[in-house]
């Protein structure tokens, strides 16, 4: 192993153990004081499988993980052990990944609008890859970090995407030549051409267009004296089952277009941000009912239906200003699982779930049909791994989410066998070696040089 993980960091569980299994087992054996806290549960096996899947479909691509997605230490350590690089948007994120031992060569300062203090921190601690998308940002980098390797960002017009990153990030193709010329004037080295595709984009062909645009930028750079040797494929990969576009569809488009637009001798190393793909579905979160309001009586609905509807309002210890922020930003509708499965003859009531904020926006979900709950009951929400459990609540006095990390013995042994020792894993700048370090990716399993648990896939 590379040395990021300690067995004591994780609860060791049986193979096939789910986050729900972990939650139920730990809750049954916990005291009331412990179970009354907001808690999240993470089983690392799914991340290990997703990493192998990523290498299978994109063997040339080196994944980077955006720390802002989920900066839980257990997650970062597993990803570091798997060999991922880290995309950091702040000084605090760079400090965090360096604290667990990640070398500066595997860190990108990927915020295109950086504070000067952040640039100086990167310079002091050896982080040389910095992104930019305009001349003003470039001037700041030249002044505060003259040895930096610049990372120019080109936008992709993902008109159908859920999050339109081009509103804030990326330089249009029209202005890219002038930005590249500014790099030359600042005596910086331009080494990479990334592009951004918004999360939730339903059209895989957006990646094809982006790769074609990046090829044009490579040509512009060559004409102005820059030999760009890295192509960053951006992010936006689907991370949940049932997404409109499957991960395999996206990788198929990328796989077909990369050889066409980057043929030998332009066989450039590739990087990407596999953020939501890695963690979205690997956490479940437990919250509690803290208050309950009596069924609401609506004269209007009574007149329309002929019967008084029973709508119960439950208040939870977390809301949309904390772990359920996806309700505001991603238009999700969280659906809880109950502590106990209701019997077939148990009546269901129209119910709504609200967070602790005293305002009309902190509605987690409504229109749910649930059995009658009591104060102190807990509800479980799946798919809480991305921009959720690690989000600091905007409400004063709310508690941090306590995370329990688990891993099967099989996944632990797979991690032990799949990487070189840290001192041998010297990652040279500009060189994109396969993260598998000798692992052969096949259709059904990953065959390691010494040990390979076939069932991990």
From Swiss-Prot:
PROSITE patterns: ODR_DC_2_2. It holds the Pfam family Orn_DAP_Arg_deC. Induction: Up-regulated in activated mast cells (MC) (at protein level). It comes from the Eukaryota. Ubiquitinated, leading to its proteasomal degradation; a process that is reduced in presence of antizymes. May also be degraded through the lysosomal degradative pathway in a proteasomal-independent manner. Keywords: Cell projection, Cytoplasm, Cytoplasmic vesicle, Golgi apparatus, Membrane, Nucleus, Transport, Ubl conjugation. InterPro entries: Ala_racemase/Decarboxylase_C (IPR009006), De-COase2_C (IPR022643), De-COase2_CS (IPR022657), De-COase2_N (IPR022644), Orn/DAP/Arg_de-COase (IPR000183), Orn_de-COase (IPR002433), PLP-binding_barrel (IPR029066). GO terms for molecular function: catalytic activity; ornithine decarboxylase activator activity. The N-terminus domain is necessary for its localization to the ER-Golgi intermediate compartment (ERGIC). This is Antizyme inhibitor 2. The gene is Azin2.
